[in-house]
Amino acid sequence: MKPENKLPVLDLISAEMKTVVNTLQPDLPPWPATGAIAEQRQYYTLERRFWNVGAPEMATRAYRVPTKYGQVKTRLFYPQPDSPATLFYLHGGGFILGNLDTHDRIMRLLASYSQCTVIGIDYTLSPEARFPQAIEEIVAACCYFHQQAEDYQINMSRIGFAGDSAGAMLALASALWLRDKQIDCGKVAGVLLWYGLYGLRDSVTRRLLGGVWDGLTQQDLQMYEEAYLSNDADRESPYYCLFNNDLTREVPPCFIAGAEFDPLLDDSCLLYQTLAAHQQPCEFKLYSGMLHAFLHYSRMMKTADEALRDGAQFFTAQL
């Protein structure tokens, strides 16, 4: 689609979203011109520092957990001594960017609002790790904490998965993996999904939206996919194209959040319509005037804070 035919997104977003877009960080270096992933990761981590300031203080612990691929870093947030459940958080970043630091504020707020222990899993990024390694690492971490729950003072009788963007796909894929392979890590009480991608190859929103402001042009999406997948056949895997999985039975309750000007919005809409049509418990909420990745900006935007509160409230209602 010719760029000129796309919607003038930056003219249409909300006032608070425009404030975020226009926020300058004087000490931030320019986006790396080489395109090297290592440099992009470093830039992303630096850029997110500003947005992670001022998060709630709470007991926090860092542990490395074993997987068949080696050890994976995790970060545990304890908002209270007696948590009613444990929520595993998977960060976004197109499978190639992001870490526990870039999403620290999101995890702290989620722990504070839910009063549940939140465990961030620093799964191995792509292209170093290819599908389905990240999912297998997440599942291995869940199993490890389930077996060692007493040692870590966590409640693993009820768990949940949460994630943004690529992390949302990993969250739902991990929940389906546990179901399909009959792995017991505790009851999956809910899944929280903020503006994820779930397997659409094309859509109206992917055509009309996406640009340099969100890194989600069709070319960008293709690049993320090629970095993540092992081969072309993986595109149809039920753990990548989640619409190829069985969404008619035993899907944990899903909170599905969409951003109005997100190219991936149709993925969320289709997921909600599919689950609702088959009487699977789910809730969809559209956040008006928002761009993809708006969850990061709760330091400045009430809507981002609201979206985190909504997800936390949905999860605690399932307990």
UniProtKB/Swiss-Prot annotation:
<dbReference type="Pfam" id="PF07859">
    <property type="entry name" value="Abhydrolase_3"/>
</dbReference>
<feature type="active site">
    <location>
        <position position="165"/>
    </location>
</feature>
<dbReference type="InterPro" id="IPR033140">
    <property type="entry name" value="Lipase_GDXG_put_SER_AS"/>
</dbReference>
<keyword id="KW-0719">Serine esterase</keyword>
<comment type="similarity">
    <text>Belongs to the 'GDXG' lipolytic enzyme family.</text>
</comment>
<protein>
    <recommendedName>
        <fullName>Acetyl esterase</fullName>
        <ecNumber>3.1.1.-</ecNumber>
    </recommendedName>
</protein>
<dbReference type="GO" id="GO:0052689">
    <property type="term" value="F:carboxylic ester hydrolase activity"/>
</dbReference>
<feature type="short sequence motif" description="Involved in the stabilization of the negatively charged intermediate by the formation of the oxyanion hole">
    <location>
        <begin position="91"/>
        <end position="93"/>
    </location>
</feature>
<feature type="active site">
    <location>
        <position position="292"/>
    </location>
</feature>
<comment type="function">
    <text>Displays esterase activity towards short chain fatty esters (acyl chain length of up to 8 carbons). Able to hydrolyze triacetylglycerol (triacetin) and tributyrylglycerol (tributyrin), but not trioleylglycerol (triolein) or cholesterol oleate. Negatively regulates MalT activity by antagonizing maltotriose binding. Inhibits MelA galactosidase activity.</text>
</comment>
<dbReference type="InterPro" id="IPR013094">
    <property type="entry name" value="AB_hydrolase_3"/>
</dbReference>
<dbReference type="InterPro" id="IPR002168">
    <property type="entry name" value="Lipase_GDXG_HIS_AS"/>
</dbReference>
<keyword id="KW-0378">Hydrolase</keyword>
<dbReference type="InterPro" id="IPR050300">
    <property type="entry name" value="GDXG_lipolytic_enzyme"/>
</dbReference>
<dbReference type="GO" id="GO:0005737">
    <property type="term" value="C:cytoplasm"/>
</dbReference>
<keyword id="KW-0963">Cytoplasm</keyword>
<dbReference type="InterPro" id="IPR023508">
    <property type="entry name" value="Acetyl_esterase"/>
</dbReference>
<comment type="subunit">
    <text>Homodimer. Interacts with MalT and MelA.</text>
</comment>
<dbReference type="InterPro" id="IPR029058">
    <property type="entry name" value="AB_hydrolase_fold"/>
</dbReference>
<feature type="active site">
    <location>
        <position position="262"/>
    </location>
</feature>
